[in-house]
Amino acid sequence: MLGVGGGSASAQWQRISSLPCALAYGASVTTPEGIVCLGGTSNGQKSEDFAVLLSTDKNGQLQSQNLPVLPVSLDNFAAAYGDGYIYAAGGLHNGIPNRRAFRLHWPLPTAWFETQTGAAWEELPQLPGPARVQPVAVVQKGAIGSNFYLLGGYDPRYRKAVANGAFYDPRKNNWYATSLITTKILSSKESSSQQAPSPIVSPDEEGEREICLVGASAIPSGAAHILCFGGVDKRIFEQALDRNYQLSDTTIQTAVRLAQLREEMYYYMTQVPSWYRFRRSLLVYHTITDSWAEVFDSPLIARAGAAVVPVTSAAGSASLSALVIGGEEKPGVRSSDVTRVDIAYTAHFGWLNWTVLILYLLGMVYLGYYFMKRASNSSEDFFKGGGRIPWWAAGISIFATMLSAITYMSIPAKAYATDWTYYPMQICILLVSFPVIKYYLPFFRRLNVTTAYEYLERRFNSATRLMASVLFIVFMIARTALVLFLPSLAMTAVTGINIYICIALMALITILYCTMGGVEAVVWGDVIQGIILVGGAILAAVYLIVNTGEHGASDFWQIATDHDKFRLFLFDPEHPFDFVNATWWVVILGGLANNLISYTSDQTVIQRYLTTSDEKSAARGILTNGLMSVVVTIAFFTIGTGLYTFFQTHPAELDITMAKSDAIFPFFMMSQLPAGLAGLLIAAVFAATMSTIASNINSISTAFTVDLWGKVHSRTLPKGGASDSQTTSGNESPSLGEAIGVGQASTVKVARIAGICAGLLGMAIACLMATVDIQSLLDYFNTILGLLSGAIGGLFLMGIFFPRIGSRAALVGFFCGTASVFYLNFCTQANFLLFGFVSIVVSVLVALVLSIFWPQKDEQPGLTWQTLESPLPTSPKGEE
């Protein structure tokens, strides 16, 4: 065994140990616990039972520990580690091709090393198709989760290289074939121009060619790429296999033919290395689009049987680095060369794109300043916009707020990786609009509340209001962090600016803009931002469709339909009640529940209901948002499908170092769109982000000022937040500042300070999130939504529809509902979309049962659906 140490200039190879026995053609994988060495052969005939872990002890000394051996001894096979398993498949068993595959849960339990019991290899379904000798193996993320990929190899029985790969999906316990290993010939023709002509094979012609992966090595790269280094030429290799077979087959030999074969063998073994056409190009496989490409060409990696080791890059160096060690430079001739390969994607934002983006940001800051004078001395203006917002603007504002960068980037990324199975959730927004308008909106408008949680105090008690408001604030801070992180990730990918600088800039600009002008600036900012982001999405969708393949829209449609990219519902007849995957009923239930939560208990949305002049206008705004969600979101799913079709027909255009799948859309913006248009779309990402963050910060400051600070400083309990001039049902209501016994200027000052603090805290959490590996931020967001806010929606459902439920039963039901989703998240495999639904159902059912023992004692005039038209109580409900 050899090791290398020291810096790049002083690195020296050192002999550090020897293996327990001399073996060749085994497999080794690197794990956090050390190097696992498996199988091999000592004589080229018999496969050996061999499995050891090589690691260092506390003193830094190398140690060898025995591991469970494979169920069958193997050589010339491939192994890989990832997602808690070591996989092994293919190869030979005592000279016989093997189609069996195995995996071992890793790391092993400590008891194994003490008792040699408690761990064993698990046999997987048999490999599909022919046997695979000398394949390459990698564990890499696919469209949904990680898979075990076994690519290439050859079947000695048919003397043919295997033309494709296969991958094992652990979620379905099944193998699936990849596309054929074919690529377009490098246009530069470097490869053929520097290689000696061969009388045995003809030169490649223009077009696609088949490639074999025999004698190659592979490593994962980024979020969804597999890089294949080296390997033999398919046609030369297959002719060599056939020649060897004929030399060993005595039934077809004649003296003349035998002499001819020996002459060909001599000629074959005595050529210069370039004649053999060992692969000089880096062959890249993309797991999502199932496509192959060659990305660069170098004679330094033209070896077969080399080891490829990823290395950690120093700060500021290449995005991906690997060492190509040893191998053969030609058949029978080993190489001691070591080549370092550095790969990086470099993006330049450009002055024109910066100009577009800066103009947009300055415009948003000016908008906040414009409304600052109108909101600075009036709490009614700051929190409700004075009731001056038109219904259509309120609807667009709700849409822009709920859209966010999560939709703008993650939905295209989700549709790009999978299909349209999440689209029915958008239809659920429109469906939920009708019960929200009929059953919920009247309470928020007629009670003249400033925050949604004031209703909970009137219906239950102040403890319920405070708890719900605090949880809302916690959730909004988490959401702020997430939607800060997403565009910062995009900007880092497309400009190279440090992600932490991006987060800080985004947060500070947004804090300045939203705390200056209050909710009116936020709403009109949402309108402008909504126009920008919708226009940008339509432009991107059209560009992707037109530029797919050679025939534009027809290729887009053909590829998308061939790969089932428009599928709306996932249904498995064998598992109709599958609650792990995003099946049709999981998406529908989750969409209805999560949207009901957002549109009935989310202060950022409910605050928009209160900015219009009357209840009818608010209802129109809600319907406007529902219709926009159904129609406009089609553009975002079309973008995702377009990204798939575009990059499947242009696989070499992908960034093989892209670490986050959610960055695919901004990467497309900067790598494919002309300057200026790319800046406009990046501005649209900023617009989606700022509309959401501004609403979050404004609603946090409202909830804190009204529900927390206002309660502490109140001299009289507020009946609502209307200003001196606004009336409700003919009765004047005091302003918020008057209601809590302080001036309006002081109230607005507290609200601004609360908004600044919330924004800074969200910024800090976003910086922490930048260090976490999250494959799908859309999934992550919906998980947080279900965990933190589901049972709050249950509280409003209890209050409005179940007059028998009192405060004690409601609180216990709330905690039971919250506990149920934490149990689902940490102890089951239930899909995150179900969390909100389960939380609502459990909280309401528990509260109903407990209401038998703790019924609501007092009547609730005007606070339940049954008594909506009754006169309101003169003061909020106290403690039970």
PLM-predicted stretches and their roles:
Residues A9-F349:
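Kelch-like beta-propeller repeat domains
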Residues Q194-Q195, Q726, Q744:
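Low-complexity, intrinsically disordered or signal/transmembrane-proximal segments
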Residues G3-V4, E205-E208, G720-G721, G737-A739, ...:
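Glycine-biased, low-complexity coil/linker segments
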Residues A344-K719, G741-E880:
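Membrane-embedded helix-loop-helix hairpins and adjacent transmembrane boundary segments
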Residues V4, I185, I200-V201, V522, ...:
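Short hydrophobic transmembrane-like helices used for membrane targeting/insertion
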Residues S191-S192, P718, T728:
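Intrinsically disordered, low-complexity proline-rich tandem-repeat tracts
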